[in-house]
UniProtKB/Swiss-Prot annotation:
GO function terms (MF aspect): DNA binding; DNA-directed RNA polymerase activity; magnesium ion binding; zinc ion binding
Gene from which this protein is expressed: rpoC
Entries under PANTHER family matching the protein: DNA-DIRECTED RNA POLYMERASE (PTHR19376), DNA-DIRECTED RNA POLYMERASE SUBUNIT BETA (PTHR19376:SF54)
Binding-site list for Zn(2+) 1: 71, 73, 86, 89
Protein's name in the database: DNA-directed RNA polymerase subunit beta'
Pfam entry (one): RNA_pol_Rpb1_4
Family: Belongs to the RNA polymerase beta' chain family.
Domain of life according to the entry: Bacteria
CC annotations in GO: DNA-directed RNA polymerase complex
NCBIfam families reported for this sequence: rpoC_TIGR
Length: 1417
């Protein structure tokens, strides 16, 4: 018995006990040590007996028996001969499954280079030998000789020789030197390398060299050499002399019916290798001519290449059906490869799938499960119960009963299923709410019934969607399903913290209908004692549902102790609202119910309920809302008839007016007054406006009706038109869709996105004619094509996001940092896009928040801001708060809970072990399909209107100016002379209300700190030209303004005024090239004037195209324009929107024409120009002058002599995130990416919390470039994980050494995923071959920190409930390391006796367990 226990133990070797996976190069000896024998023959199985051939690819002697515990010849059978090796056939008697583990090997007659290390760029062999790949290939494939040992000759080691050169050299020096070809030569060179010496040489070279490219190349080689030294890999192992053979059950040969066999491609590839190898051996024995041997060696090299990576070099070897054979590399890479097909995406047992239908009577935690499915899924449980209760004596009998579907089986099934949660999943699972747990209710029929409120989370509808069912088997799994995944625990969305269990469609319509009020309804003005009486009155037909009445309402309000106290008031309300109040949970205010409830209001109800009362009452309330909504939607009898689409009478006159305008424009075009482009834009504008007017008339018509009230007076009220109610409540449809039903369809777009200028004037009620229908099909088809593309693109974005963020887990409570990011309300122009409270809700404060204007602490640091504290912030009008952020978190491999803040789906501080990276990726990726794929073309008409020329304030308050320089002109107005001036309006409490950017040269009517009133225009400027503003008063003196050389004179025909236009440098005659046209201001005596407060002469250089309207010696006053520079009217710009924009931001792509930012602070000047570029110089107060070449066509925002700050805009354009990071730091780049991504989502009405985007930004900022390495393990210019540098720096600080300096680097998400520390994760993402090659050469260790690596190696992930498990494991390891225990032999025996189990004991304890399980039920 002892043996059996031992044996069973040995069978289930636990693979849990490892912490690191290391990858490296296998030495020939290692390959031989894995092997169980050499494969000598290419045969597979005997065609007569179907037994494996001896020494062949399936040999039983090498790989193990074909049948369990039976040798090949049949001499030994059964368990008792276990471990015997049969003397006849040489097969060990053991289990068949060893054929999945035992490897063989092939001794190669000639060395062969491993194609991965040769061809995977950069070629490792090439890098080591410092030879180009082309040359190495010529040696390997027998085209050239390579000198291995030059001896006393004047050849160099590693020099290539052609046939002729080799023969010449042999004639000349005989056997003084040694040159070879093929893999032997490369192997010899690699073997001869002295790695430490080579490293020394390279280090010296690195010190001496100055060229950047050379440095890069040397650093690369140095890293590779050091990797070899550290990992203990030998370079010559990249050339193989022994080839391992995969176990045969992993490349099976399967008999098909009809006597044919299906085989794995690998067998073909191995056969080729063995054939060629054997032939080569024979040729070598026969001492065949060199050329034949050489050819055979080349073929061997090619066949091994094909086995390892078919198609990497030359043409892929194809099988009998012209299809390339699948090599070892193909097995692991790509979507169908081992990683993504079998390790990251496994199929699951105990699962089923079926169509879903509605279950309107279910509770939120229930789902309807068809009896048939349940019976099949819970089979093992039913068998166990049948046996333990004595209905069946054996499993077989139980099976029979289940198949016969005896009556008792159904009773037991009901018992088994009770409180056993099951998981429902709808593909595509875009976020974690795509899998939720429910308690099953057995139902007749074959469709799964789903609760309507969870449809939003699953994105399910009932038009034929299918869902999968999974059964959690173990007790732990059931517990987790119930505690974490139950639908009742997932009320809030993890993306934004708002309820995701919200009613839609019918329910919304029902509640809206129920809470509407009506003028002069039956029984208006009644007094009712409570909602019960209201319901009674309604049921007996005394009142209508919408009648306005007075009802006594009892609300429950929490007192100081936190207990509910009733408060009763008489309230003006309607019957419907009073009835709805009956389902309200205790503690909700009636005011929330006493309104017409649309979709938003209902969502707010559930949110308030959750925040005030917690989960349980909210879930019950949500269910009640649903039942009530369905009931009253049925009562309302809303239906859509054609007469509900009321066409406004004004429609036809609006359309005819528009047609007249269009005809007029057409006439203007034909007489040449407007260009074709202008005509097109104007026509489209006219029709767009007409469409708006029709829509407005239609909505006015639809949305209100006139009724007679109790006094007999006419009164307007909201209409009870069904279509209007559906749109108004948010149940279905929108104003835009109603416009197409009853207004006019309007303008349609062509598939390329341009607008067709003839609109569809008909609507769907009138019907479209053939032409109109044809035009409208354009748009519809494009919509469908877009959707398909969008889904794929969005899925790929999600995959990249998950991959980059998967290893980010909350691993500690507080990292103790004082850093954070400053949050302010998002204000664009005159409106608040997002209030401060919405941005900081659920964050932790990084520094004490003070009451504005005092030193009083409102909120202490490290406090989590909840709704109550946000109210405090609001009431004290705080307008900026420093909150902690994931980006500034100091935790090394992960983040801390304090920096993350609130768990949005639960409403409290996030727990340790939460996988915030994956949550963030899913939250950003899930709405991806709702984003557009389009690039928006803005027509000329639209972009012309977009240029503002003044600022009109919307709120009364105080005006504030930031980064401002100005001069005051004669009229007392301010003229700006600074570039990025920001103007804000602040209210009486000091809150920012409006925020504008004001351009250079704008004229302000109010100054800093002055009061402004709403509607006042505070600034205006000319949008088409940029002035050069005089900063002093004086007389104009022209410098280098020479007619014909640098300027031309133009006279305006209409006004007769003449102006001077400065020529571009390129257009000037040679004599004028070096002249620098400028205007200097002098006083009456002709002396220079200095700009006040500086020692700079008032002299203004004029760029090309500048227009001067003054004459020489004219008098100018301060603040007047000296010249104007026309701003080139920017044509139609494409704005990348939607998904592509989000992808660009996360991939950190550089825009086409990026903005140019100042690299340092200093004074701007221009140096010598080249053909197409100008030289911009920035001279700082001290230090080196910085210079940059800028293309001439870029419009610059700075003049000569102007002061700029580091990071200021020099030329407009889209900013590059890399520049922002380099010049303005981590905070600025975070803010930029977060705001830009949010902009796209906000446009689509999708809410995502900022912190999800910050999580991704943190992952993009994981790496840094070492700038000063000192004597650390890093190389300068090396890309390293920031966390690693921080760890090293902490150590160095303790030792008192100087700290390693580094610059943060921003990587796009794909790059960042591939640059992750874990090679397993990177390999399973993209470019598998390259990643594995790199990892093997460097002998990388994978610490298995992330989720992906752990899923792949089959362990619990270190997140969620697995987080604690891994922590405990590590604690145990540490403890066992600390306490070595030595036992005496007697002790050991005693312990062994205690642990020995007899068969009786085992049976007894098993029975006991089953009984316990029974009792538990």
């Amino acid at each position: 018995m002892k043996d059996l226990v031992k044996f069973l133990k040995a069978q289930s070797k636990t693979s849990e006990d490892f912490d690191v996976i290391k990858i490296g190069l296998a030495s020939p000896d290692m390959i031989r040590s894995w092997s169980f024998g050499e494969v000598k023959k290419p045969e597979t199985i005997n065609y007569r007996t179907f037994k494996p051939e001896r020494d062949g690819l399936f040999c039983a002697r090498i790989f193990g028996p074909v049948k369990d515990y039976e040798c090949l010849c049949g001499k030994y059978k059964r368990l008792k001969h276990r471990g015997v090796i049969c003397e006849k056939c040489g097969v060990e008697v053991t289990q068949t499954k060893v054929r999945r583990e035992r490897m063989g090997h092939i001794e190669l007659a000639s060395p062969v280079a491993h194609i991965w290390f040769l061809k995977s760029l950069p070629s490792r062999i090439g890098l080591l030998l410092d030879m180009p790949l082309r040359d190495i290939e010529r040696v390997l494939y027998f085209e050239s000789y390579i000198v291995i040992e030059p001896g006393m000759t004047d050849l160099d080691k590693g020099q290539l020789l052609t046939e002729e050169q080799y023969i010449d050299a042999e004639d000349r020096w005989g056997d003084e030197f040694d040159a070879k070809m093929g893999a032997e030569a490369i192997q010899a060179l690699l073997r001869d390398m002295d790695l430490p010496q080579e490293c020394e040489n390279l280090r010296e070279e690195l010190q001496e060299t100055n060229s950047e490219t050379k440095r890069k190349k040397i650093t690369k080689r140095l890293k590779l050499l050091e990797a070899f030294i550290q990992s203990g890999n030998k370079p010559e192992w990249m050339v193989m002399t022994v080839l391992p053979v995969l176990p045969p059950d992993l490349r099976p040969l399967v008999p098909l019916d009809g006597g044919r066999f299906a085989t794995s491609d690998l067998n073909d590839l191995y056969r080729r290798v063995i054939n060629r190898n054997n032939r080569l051996k024979r040729l070598l024995d026969l001492i065949a001519p060199d050329i034949i041997v050489r050819n055979e060696k080349r073929m061997l090299q090619e066949s091994v290449d094909a086995l390892l990576d078919n198609g990497r070099r030359g043409r892929a070897i194809t099988g009998s059906n012209r299809r390339p054979l699948k090599s070892l590399a193909d097995m692991i890479k790509g979507k169908q490869g081992r990683f993504r097909q079998n390790l990251l995406g496994k199929r699951v047992d105990y699962s089923g799938r079926s169509v879903i239908t509605v279950g309107p009577y279910l509770h939120l935690h229930q789902c309807g499960l068809p009896k048939k499915m349940a019976l099949e899924l819970f089979r093992p449980f039913i068998y166990a119960k049948l046996e333990s209760r004595g209905f069946a004596s054996t499993i077989k009998a139980a099976k029979k009963m289940v198949e016969r579907e005896d009556a008792i089986v159904w009773d037991i099934l009901a018992d088994v299923i009770r409180e056993h949660p099951i998981l429902l999943n709808r593909a595509p699972t875009l976020h974690r709410l795509g899998i939720q747990a429910f308690e099953p209710l057995l139902i007749e029929g074959k469709a799964i019934q789903l609760h309507p409120l969870v449809c939003a989370a699953f994105n399910a509808d009932f038009d034929g969607d299918q869902m999968a069912v999974h059964v959690p088997l173990t007790l732990e799994a059931q517990l987790e399903a119930r505690a974490l995944m139950m639908s009742t625990n997932n009320i809030l969305s993890p993306a934004n913290g708002e309820p995701i269990i919200v009613p839609s469609q019918d329910v919304v319509l029902g509640l809206y209908y129920m809470t509407r009020d009506k003028v002069n309804g039956k029984g208006e003005g009644m007094l009712l004692q409570d909602p019960r009486e209201a319901e009674k009155a309604y049921r007996t037909g005394q009142v209508e549902l919408h009648s306005r009445v007075k009802v006594r309402i009892t609300e429950y309000v929490k007192n100081a102790v936190g207990e509910f106290e009733p408060q009763t008031n008489l309230v003006d309300t309607t019957i419907g609202r009073a009835i709805l109040w009956m389902i309200a949970p205790k503690g909700m205010p009636f005011s929330l119910f006493n309104q017409t409830l649309g979709k938003k209001a209902i969502s707010k109800l559930i949110n308030e309920s959750y925040r005030r009362l917690g989960m349980k009452p909210s879930v019950l309330f949500a269910d009640q809302i649903m039942y009530t909504g369905f009931a009253y939607a049925a009562r309302s009898g809303s239906s859509v008839g054609i007469d509900d689409m009321v066409i406004p009478a004004k429609k036809y006159e609006i359309i005819s007016a528009a047609e007249d305008e269009v005809a007029e424009i057409q006439e203007q075009f034909q007489s040449g007054l407007v260009t074709a482009g202008e005509r097109y834009n104007k026509v489209i504008d006219i029709w767009a406006a007409a469409n708006e007017r029709v829509a407005k008339a239609m909505m006015e018509n639809l949305s209100t009706e006139e009724v007679i009230n109790r006094e007999g007076q006419p009164e307007k009220q909201a209409s009870f038109n069904s279509i209007f109610m559906m749109a108004d409540s948010g149940a279905r449809g929108s104003a835009a869709q109603i416009r197409q039903l009853a207004g006019m369809r309007g303008l349609m777009a062509r598939p390329d996105g341009s607008i067709i200028e003839t609109p569809i004037t008909a609507n769907f009620r009138e019907g479209l004619n053939v032409l109109q229908y044809f035009i409208s099909t354009h748009g519809a088809r494009k919509g469908l094509a877009d959707t398909a593309l969008k889904t794929a693109n969005s899925g790929y974005l999600t995959r990249r996001l998950v991959d980059v963020a998967q290893d980010l887990v909350i691993i500690e409570d507080d990292c103790g940092t004082h850093e954070g990011i400053v949050m302010t309300p998002l204000i664009e122009g005159g409106d608040v896009k997002e209030a401060l409270r919405d941005r900081v809700l659920g964050r932790v404060v990084a520094e004490d928040v003070l009451k504005p204007g005092t030193e009083e602490v409102l909120i202490a640091r490290n406090t989590l801001l909840d709704e109550k504290l946000c109210d405090v912030i609001d009431s004290n009008s705080v307008d900026s708060i420093k909150v902690r952020s994931v980006v500034t978190c100091n935790t090394d491999f992960g983040v801390c809970a304090k920096c993350y803040g609130r768990d949005l789906a639960r409403g409290h501080l996030i727990n340790q072990g939460e996988a915030v990276g994956v949550i963030a990726a899913q939250s950003i990726g899930e709405p991806g399909t709702q984003l557009t794929m389009r690039t928006f073309h803005i027509g000329g008409a639209a972009s012309a209107a977009a240029k503002e020329s003044s600022i009109q304030v919307k709120n009364t308050g105080t005006l504030r100016l930031a980064n401002v320089k100005f001069v005051t002109n004669n009229e007392g107005k301010l003229v700006l002379t600074s570039r990025n001036t920001e103007l804000t309006i602040i209210d009486a409490f000091g809150r920012t209300k409006e925020h504008y950017k004001v351009p250079y040269g704008a004229i302000l009517s109010k100054g800093d700190g002055q009061e402004v009133t709403a509607g006042e225009t505070v600034a205006n400027w000319d949008p088409h030209t940029m002035p050069v503003v005089s900063e002093v008063s004086g007389f104009v003196k022209f410098i280098d303004l020479i007619d014909g050389l640098t300027v031309t004179r133009q006279t305006d025909e209409l006004t007769g005024l003449s102006s001077i236009v400065v020529q571009d440098v390129g257009e000037r005659a040679t004599a004028g090239k070096d002249l620098r046209p400028a205007i200097k201001l002098v006083d009456a005596k002709g002396n220079d004037i200095l700009i006040p407060g500086t020692d700079v002469v008032a002299q203004y250089f004029l760029p090309g195209k500048a227009i001067v309207t003054l004459d020489d010696n004219a008098e100018v006053h301060i603040g007047e324009p000296l010249a104007r520079i026309p701003q080139e009217s920017v044509g139609t710009k494409d704005i990348t929107g939607g998904l592509p924009r989000v992808a660009d931001l996360f991939e950190a792509r550089k825009p086409k024409e990026p903005a140019i930012l100042a690299e340092i602070s200093g004074i701007v000047s221009f140096g010598k120009e080249t053909k197409g570029k100008r030289r911009l110089l920035i001279t700082p107060a001290e230090g080196e002058t910085y210079e940059e070449m800028i293309p001439k066509w870029r419009q610059l925002n700075v003049f000569e002599g102007e002061m700029v700050e580091r990071g200021d805009l020099i030329s407009d354009g889209a900013e590059t995130p890399h520049d922002i990071l380099r010049l303005r730091g981590v905070h600025a780049v975070t803010e930029y990416i977060v705001n830009e991504v949010q902009e796209v989502y906000r446009l689509q009405g999708v809410k995502i919390n900022d912190k999800h985007i910050e999580v991704i930004v943190r992952q993009m900022l994981r790496k840094g470039i070492v700038t000063k390495a000192y004597d650390s393990e890093f190389l300068e210019g090396e890309q390293v994980e920031v966390a690693r540098v921080k760890i090293v720096n902490r150590k160095r600080e303790a030792e008192g050494k100087p700290l390693v300096e580094f610059e943060r680097e921003l990587l796009g998400i794909t790059k960042a995923s591939l640059a992750t520390e874990s090679f397993i994760s990177a390999a399973s993402f993209q470019e598998t071959t390259r990643v594995l090659t790199e990892a093997a050469v460097a002998g990388k260790r994978d610490e298995l920190r992330g989720l992906k690596e752990n899923v792949i190696v089959g362990r619990l992930i270190p997140a969620g409930t697995g987080f604690a498990y891994h922590q405990n494991r590590q604690k145990k390891v540490v403890m066992s390391d600390e306490m070595p225990v030595k036992l005496s032999a007697a002790d050991e025996e005693e312990i062994a006796a205690e642990f020995t189990v007899t068969a009786e004991d085992a049976t007894a304890s098993l029975a006991e367990m089953l009984n316990m399980a029974d009792d538990a039920e």
